[in-house]
Amino acid sequence: MSLAENLTAVQQAITAACRRAGRDPKSVTLLAVSKGMPPELVREAAALGQTLFGENKVQEAKAKIPLCPGRLRWQMIGHLQSNKCRDAVHLFEMIQSVDTPGLAEEINRWAEKQAKTMPVLLEVNLAGESTKFGFSPDRLLAELGALNALPKIEVHGLMTIAPWAPEPEKVRPLFRKLRELKLQCEDKLGASLPHLSMGMSGDFTVAIEEGATIVRIGTALFGPRPKAARPPASEGGG
């Protein structure tokens, strides 16, 4: 199918999942995962009305973003190294993959230098997979107050990467667990966290049924990435 057909199919699946869950389809944002994809495809998606894109690597984003329409919005969804924080804070409207207190502090430092406040999501490793990054639920709750106190960071919610499963229903308990963890975080902070970023091409409808507000879709939109561009399982969208 063409990109236009794929985009329509994904949007229809989002709407159907929202209806099953009794949710407004406008409460779910489609983030198009453009990692490994050329600027031409991003421009084609933009011409079809897609405006939010996600990248996994700062260097790739740094080269790609200037070649794309300026009205597009970009978020960082892959593992971020501390030495890339300066560029990440400059390039992205949100960093979804904050996985350690040290990284949060470095983002805060560069946001202060660049005179901006950086929205972030805290990445949670719910399945305890050694191949993936993220806070354990217990550590997240223990560190949450200190993370939220950083003056140039705004914690907007949580993100997770579910293990691959042939049947999406198998990861439903993890998505439900992230939603419940967000409620615990809100109780601890005494404030609402607007976002749950969870669900990729193979399981996003289940994620929506469990409360996702952002779904990260790559393959279902753009087709399989070239082999050289395929990221490891620890990366944040597909």
Model-assigned labels for residue ranges:
Residues 1, 235-238:
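Eukaryotic N-terminal low-complexity, Ser/Thr- and Lys/Arg-rich leader segments
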Residues 1-202, 208-210, 222-224:
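Conserved alpha/beta-domain cores
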